Amino acid sequence: MQQSEGNKMSTLVLELRQGDLMVVNGAPIRFRNRTRIELAAKARFLFGKQIMAPDAANTPARRIYFALQTAYIGADEERGPGLAAARDLIRDFMEATTSPTVREMLDRAREAAEGDDCYSALRIARRVMRHEEEVLGIPPLPSPRRDPLPNPAPG
């Protein structure tokens, strides 16, 4: 990932591999070949291992991440409910955890999300997920990057 600056507008250049998944402004895009794209306008996007599938949200920290992801890249009508769900899940996790460090991280994630900086909130939530994985002894999530491409629809 690199940024290049033009006269007035900054662009973001991403190199994506075959099979990579990217969500831009709520629209999922799967790349069939290796490609390089340039985002020339502000967009809400995640790609590769940043994207969590709904069925992977199977622990408290992962549910927080998924709710924040929805608040960030969901369709317009999903973003508000995603943020509300994240608030509730963060509150519940903060009440249940004995770790002051995790409480502080969750508080920062909530503040970032409420300040419309869901990308930063997601980065913090990933740290909470790693902590949870270590404490519970569960494996980290696999990357969706190499999921097989679906067969094209007939017709």
Residue ranges: model-predicted function:
Residues 1-155:
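Terminal leader/tail segments of proteins
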